[in-house]
Amino acid sequence: MLMPKRVKYRREHRGKMRGRAKGGTEVHFGEFGLQALEASWITNRQIEAARIAMTRYMKRGGKVWIKIFPSKPYTAKPLEVRMGSGKGAPEGWVAVVKPGKIMFEISGVSEEVAREALRLASHKLPIKCKFVKREEVGGDSNESN
């Protein structure tokens, strides 16, 4: 499971999930990616389930990059506890994902295999996602004059 090695504070505010992702909106490492279309918290267990679904479908071929990291702790109070008396104990870790963020990247496999692997991974996540390809930078062929 992904989680920080150590943190300065054990508890954080929930925060707002307004706007679109600032960075990480393009495919950089791989050839294909899975892009978020909604804002949500993605838990470390959901990230791991999506990773396993992708790697099993690809038969351990190709390479997978996980572009999100669960660095935000979420807390929960025990069942049947009255209100008040402080914030609950840390329960797990989440990654804050906003629309436009590339969550996973794949390379080393065909487009059909990558599309199906990322589709299987998207079923493990609580948000709508879409398959994206790497945008090739134009102008390389004309500069060889």
Curated annotation (Swiss-Prot):
GO terms for biological process: translation. This is Large ribosomal subunit protein uL16. PROSITE patterns: RIBOSOMAL_L16_1, RIBOSOMAL_L16_2. The keyword rRNA-binding applies. HAMAP family: Ribosomal_uL16 (MF_01342). Binds 23S rRNA and is also seen to make contacts with the A and possibly P site tRNAs. InterPro entries: Ribosomal_uL16 (IPR047873), Ribosomal_uL16_bact-type (IPR000114), Ribosomal_uL16_CS (IPR020798), Ribosomal_uL16_dom (IPR016180), Ribosomal_uL16_sf (IPR036920). Disulfide bonds: none annotated. It comes from the Bacteria. CDD domains: Ribosomal_L16_L10e. Part of the 50S ribosomal subunit. Belongs to the universal ribosomal protein uL16 family. The lineage of its organism: Bacteria, Bacillati, Bacillota, Bacilli, Bacillales. Keywords: Ribonucleoprotein, Ribosomal protein, RNA-binding, rRNA-binding, tRNA-binding. GO terms for cellular component: cytosolic large ribosomal subunit. One of its GO terms (molecular function) is rRNA binding.
